[in-house]
Structures are given as structure tokens and as C-alpha cells.
């Protein structure tokens, strides 16, 4: 891994070549990115969008959660916003609440804590969600009956040619783990409209959420979070349980014994074994319950992102 004068090298962009992706993901699986780009800020990101060759596949990396990277890596450009586009600012505050502006590379957990410190309620559910605000927007992240849609005022996005746009929650089509993000567009920042809250009460709520997470989720081993979306009227983990797969293992890839919708890396899991385990779970659940599970995680292959298993 080294700095390079790559295909979109520029003073406003840091470019690295052949970067291992496994350490940058919560699952700790995957090969190298051909290039990794860290724009210096919004202007650097715009410059990148305008000058980087269009034939190079591109992937926006947030906190690396909800992601399985192929062992053969990614033969394109990974864009990392976490080092520069990570500001969290209170734009407005009064007796009723305030507006928190957060750049896409900021961590969701840090965002929740900054809101609490400023007496702003509504983001406590993010305290236990790994990843970044950009990723949270992309999948309308949520927990404990709350989600991004419920608190989002608007978001700033950049199109494939480097121009900025603003969209509200309705225009983004936010729904359960879904967002109508135009192809090639990148989240730059978001503004959250939050109610006034008492800092200690919010802290207690966050502590309660984190306790529930510790009790329910397998935090001992690397995972990508929930592998499948919950189908209507059911919980994915219950369907996987009913199919008799709790604890099932292929190599070092395992369906967690603690939570069946979390697939963990016991130490040296390969992407092949993890995908085989995902496909096994889908097939068994379909046979047992007649339900076709849909992936919540993405699979980054050498050619780009897939949202369905299959090599």
C-alpha cells in the first residue's frame, strides 16, 4: 500500500494503491482494493467525480459494516470519506430542539453522542449502530422502532459529475432498509431535526439500547450485522432458527449461536464460505417456510456491489 499518482490523482485527493479491505470492514474478510481515494473535502470529492475515469467501478466505503468483500478484492476505486468528511455541527438550537448537520463520513455512534451532549433527542437509536451517516442514509438505518427517516430534515448529495443536490426524506424514498439513491450519486451530509431532550435521560436510553444489543448480538466475533432483511410479518432470525441452522458452520464462517441473523467470522473465514452459508440459509428457509429472504448486507465483488448471493 502506498501513495500513488493513480488514474484520478490530484492535490485535493489522497490515492493509495492495492489497499487491504478486510481491516476496513466489521466482518474482517476480503482482498485488496485496486485504488483507495480519500478526498480532502467536498471540493476534493467534486474534483474526483469530475476527473476520475468513468470506466473504473467505484464503491463508497463508510464504516465497513453491512458488507462482505470478496477474497479477490475490488478492481476499482474505493472512496473513503471517513477521514475528512466527518464534521458534526449544531446548526440551530432553541427551547424546542435543534438542527444537527452531519457529514457523510461521520460515525453514527459519535453522532448520537454529540446530539446527546447538546441536549438533542432522536438519535439515541444510532448509539449501537456501527458505520457512518452516509451508510445510515443509504439503507435508512434503524433500531428499536426508530429510523433515519423519522428525524431527517434533508440530505446533500453529489451526482456523478460533481454537482451538489438537496433532497428531503420523501424525495429520497426512504422506507424499511431502502433509499432511492440515484446511480452514481454520493451522500455528502445530512441535517437532522431533533427535539429538545435532557442529556442524562438520553444517556440512560442509550445505555439501555446498548445493554439490549450486548444481550442479543454476538459481539465477540466479527460480523457484518444483520445478514437478511426481516420479511413482512416475520423475523429473519426466527425463520433461520426454524430451518435448524443456528450455529451451522462452513469453515470459519458460522451462523451465530447467539443470533441467527448474524453470520460471524470465527477467525479465518473466506468470502466463499460466507457466501455458501448465506445461500444455504436462503435455500433452507425457502424450503421450510416458503419465504425468500432478501439480503440486507451488500457483497463487494471485483466488478462491483451485488445485493444477492451467487458467484
UniProtKB/Swiss-Prot annotation:
- PROSITE patterns per the UniProt record, alphabetical: FAD_PCMH
The annotated pathway is:
Cell wall biogenesis; peptidoglycan biosynthesis
Cite the Pfam families for this sequence: FAD_binding_4, MurB_C
One GO molecular-function annotation for this sequence? UDP-N-acetylmuramate dehydrogenase activity
Family matches, as InterPro entries: FAD-bd_PCMH, FAD-bd_PCMH-like_sf, FAD-bd_PCMH_sub1, FAD-bd_PCMH_sub2, MurB, MurB_C, MurB_C_sf, Oxid_FAD_bind_N
Group of enzyme by EC: oxidoreductase
- HAMAP family per record: MurB (MF_00037)
The family line of this record is:
Belongs to the MurB family.
Can you say what this protein is called?
UDP-N-acetylenolpyruvoylglucosamine reductase
